[in-house]
C-alpha cells in the first residue's frame, strides 16, 4: 500500500478572499467553484500549488467569521507549511506579507533546522513559509 496526503482542507468565511490569498502570495492555480446540491450553502475551491498535495478551501453559511477562536491553540491542525525553495524566496515573500499586515513572525532559522517565516490568512489559519 502506498500512502500519501491527497489534500488538506481549510474552512473559510470568505471563499473568494481566501482563494485570492493563495493565488496572490503563492502563485496557486485556483480551481472552479463547486457548490453542493446535497448540502445547501456548502461551496469549495481547490488550490493547486506547484507540487505536493492540494488545499481545499471550504465555506458555508454556518462558518463563523472569526474561526480563530481568538488565536487560541486548540486541538486540530496547527498550520500548513509551504516550501518556496530558498532563503531568498522566504525573505521576499515575508516582505510582501509584512507590507500587507499578514506576517506573524519574521524569517528565522528554527531550532529544528528550518528557515521559515509565519503568516496568517485573513481567516486566521497559520502558514509556515519554508526554504
PLM region spans:
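Vicinal oxygen chelate
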Residues: 5-13, 44-49, 68-131
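Short, charged/polar, Gly/Pro-enriched secondary-structure boundary elements
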Residues: 52-55, 65, 123-127
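Short, flexible helix/strand-to-coil boundary loops that buttress conserved ligand/catalytic motifs
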Residues: 22, 59, 94
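Core segments of cupin and vicinal oxygen chelate
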Residues: 2, 11-54
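Acetyl-CoA-dependent GNAT
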Residues: 59-64, 131
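Alpha-helical elements of the RecA-like P-loop NTPase motor core of helicases
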Residues: 19-20, 91, 127
Amino acid at each position: 500500500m502506498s500512502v500519501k496526503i491527497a489534500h488538506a482542507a481549510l474552512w473559510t468565511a470568505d471563499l473568494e478572499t481566501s482563494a485570492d490569498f493563495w493565488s496572490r502570495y503563492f502563485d496557486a492555480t485556483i480551481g472552479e467553484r463547486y457548490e453542493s446540491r446535497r448540502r445547501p450553502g456548502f461551496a469549495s475551491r481547490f488550490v493547486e500549488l506547484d507540487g505536493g498535495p492540494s488545499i481545499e478551501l471550504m465555506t458555508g453559511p454556518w462558518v463563523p467569521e472569526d474561526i480563530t477562536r481568538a488565536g487560541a491553540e486548540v486541538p486540530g491542525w496547527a498550520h500548513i507549511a509551504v516550501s518556496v525553495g530558498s532563503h531568498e524566496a522566504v525573505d521576499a515573500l515575508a516582505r510582501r506579507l509584512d507590507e500587507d499586515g499578514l506576517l506573524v513572525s519574521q524569517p528565522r532559522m528554527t531550532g529544528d533546522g528550518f528557515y521559515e517565516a509565519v503568516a496568517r490568512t485573513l481567516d486566521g489559519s497559520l502558514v509556515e513559509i519554508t526554504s
